[in-house]
Amino acid sequence: MEHKPTHTSGQCPVMHGGATSSNSSNVAWWPKALNLDILHQHDRKSNPMGADFSYREELKKLDVEALKRDLKALMTDSQDWWPADWGHYGGLMIRMAWHSAGSYRVGDGRGGADTGNQRFAPLNSWPDNANLDKARRLLWPIKQKYGNKISWADLMILAGNMAYESMGLKTFGFAFGREDIWHPEKDIYWGAEQEWLAPSGAENSRYSGERDLENPLAAVMMGLIYVNPEGVDGNPDPLKTAKDMRVTFARMGMNDEETVALTAGGHTVGKAHGNGNAANLGADPESADLEEQGLGWNNHKSRGIGRDTVTSGIEGAWTTNPTQWDNGFFHLLFSYDWWLQKSPAGAWQWEPVNIKEEDKPVDVEDPTIRHNPIMTDADMALKLDPEYRKISERFHKDPAYFSETFARAWFKLTHRDMGPKARYFGPDVPVEELIWQDPVPTGRKDYDVDAVKAKIIASGLSTGELVSTAWDSARTFRNSDKRGGANGARIRLAPQKDWLGNEPEKLAKVLNVLEAIASEFNISVADTIVLAGNVGVEQAAKAAGIAITVPFAAGRGDATIEQTDVESFEVLEPIADGFRNWQKQHYAVNPEELLLDRAQLLGLSAPEMTVLIGGLRVIGTNHGDNKHGVFTDNVGALSNDFFVNLTDMRYTWKPTGRNSYDIVERNSGNVKWTATRVDLVFGSNSILRAYAEVYAQDDNKEKFVKDFVAAWTKVMNADRFDI
């Protein structure tokens, strides 16, 4: 008789209806479907703090000096489960803060330290973030003690600041104000690679041509924060690495001097860890077993802590005194020749030739033992690249200048994604105004808004001109790093005034009129532009038979060209704007995906995106006055015609070219309207069609106008952190 195997694991007696993994999700079945989830992140359902919670109010209760004292005490309070190198956690805390902030990229403003995203996948499990889970666990007692009064996002950066101060650096300052998220971000594109640390020639590489890095990425590999410390694709060559550094740090918003300062300053303290076999490390935090309790890279096969820790695979300290801020990095870099060696873990590293015994750092556990210092390929680039070397030599000769430059660069690195100073909080906020903060003067609030509106109405500008100019001014806002927006009226300055998407000739005409009105009333052009847009919306609603007042908050200021980093603002130029049915050229990415990206950066929900599209189409704001998607015979009236005609089965849709369609009457065969993919997606995508049907209903004409005004006001005020 054949013996059949017995299943020893019991089956669950309940057939679960909840999809608790992604294996059978809609995305798995239809991977090319438009992912609207990026518009519905970080809502109240995932936030445990409640609707009434205000982090800014909690910060007012924080004893900042007590917190700083506790953090400094933590630095030298070594724990047996993860001992501090030389009895000081400074290097570990700095690396945690560096890697939290260093994921920022200027291309789309995503990444960075502003949300505390290092706690979640993928960042919590990136190879480059190995063992930073230990740093956060060391911080937990302090977070637990101060509770709601300090976010994880703020605490991680403040810990890095305090680490530097505890080792002798005078930091430039610190601002509280970063608010935690509660689940992984869904909108950030980290790269197309399907494996960690995939080389540049691998499938789905982020590089093309002669090492052209895909936008908006900054890191050279999936799973790295910036460049490969062993060299390009793990092959040591400092001059090639220098090229990678220049691209990567520029995409983080840093120039050459800041790049050298940050690299050297980051390696002035602490050490790299590679004294062991990396194969002995366990899974990363997201993959680790339940009993690991969210910790990863645990070594259960050997000691794996202290001097036997493996993290990057590179092994050693950069300086003689790794717990002290000094000029030791440049002293060693320029005092010795360096040659390539392999670490105990098998990683490439540079070590000095014939180094003096007293220049060697001592062992992390036994001060009677000394080891060679090390340099990464990036460190050697600071010596061998001609431009980097000039800067390095100046820092070497002038330690005070190096310290000041690093402190400023560190502040920029850790605060770049926080946006304007209006979001800063705390006693250590620097008074100095920095150009990378995109400063905007405070504007007037005490003026007769109705009188200004009357002047705008009598100006002769069309509804479409008023609305499109205000939209173009506000649409640059990025909720990712809080840059852009209507405040400052930088649409009248270079480079924005010349952007193709802003229709420079028409813009100049409109600005000429609005600037005269602003001058007459002694108010900001920024306020006047937004108020003019509001007037246009009110007139369009009136033309549709609905009286409504668009909310307006005065107080915007006008930035000057001296307050504007022209090169920095170039990254805000739109390559497409589905809201105005325009794109600069055809791209590999579909127009509706570009629309979704802009909506997400503006902080819009899918219903808000939908209602804005429908309203802007019928008002007549299309770029170049193109007629695509203008499904109405009454242009200029804020009606729901776009949705009514989009969902009307009297019409059929026929492609006429790439991103071009005709709307044809079924009975006559006559072409009624034309459209783009951005228009059609609101009838094609099942979710967006559901929203479109709501606004097409006969009983929702007034709701449509009210919802449009609410979404419009949200965009106009997106950068008003002062209200």
Swiss-Prot record:
Keywords noted in UniProt: Heme, Hydrogen peroxide, Iron, Metal-binding, Oxidoreductase, Peroxidase
Cellular component annotations (GO), alphabetically ordered: cytosol
Catalytic-site annotation from UniProt: H99
HAMAP family assigned: Catal_peroxid
Signal peptide: none
Organism (species): Vibrio vulnificus (strain YJ016)
Keyword Heme: yes
Cross-link (Tryptophyl-tyrosyl-methioninium (Tyr-Met) (with W-98)): Y226-M252
Lineage: Bacteria, Pseudomonadati, Pseudomonadota, Gammaproteobacteria, Vibrionales
Record-listed E.C. numbers: 1.11.1.21
Name under which the protein is recorded: Catalase-peroxidase
Transmembrane segments: none
The protein's enzyme class: oxidoreductase
PTM (free text): Formation of the three residue Trp-Tyr-Met cross-link is important for the catalase, but not the peroxidase activity of the enzyme.
UniProt GO BP: cellular response to hydrogen peroxide; hydrogen peroxide catabolic process
Family that this chain belongs to: Belongs to the peroxidase family. Peroxidase/catalase subfamily.
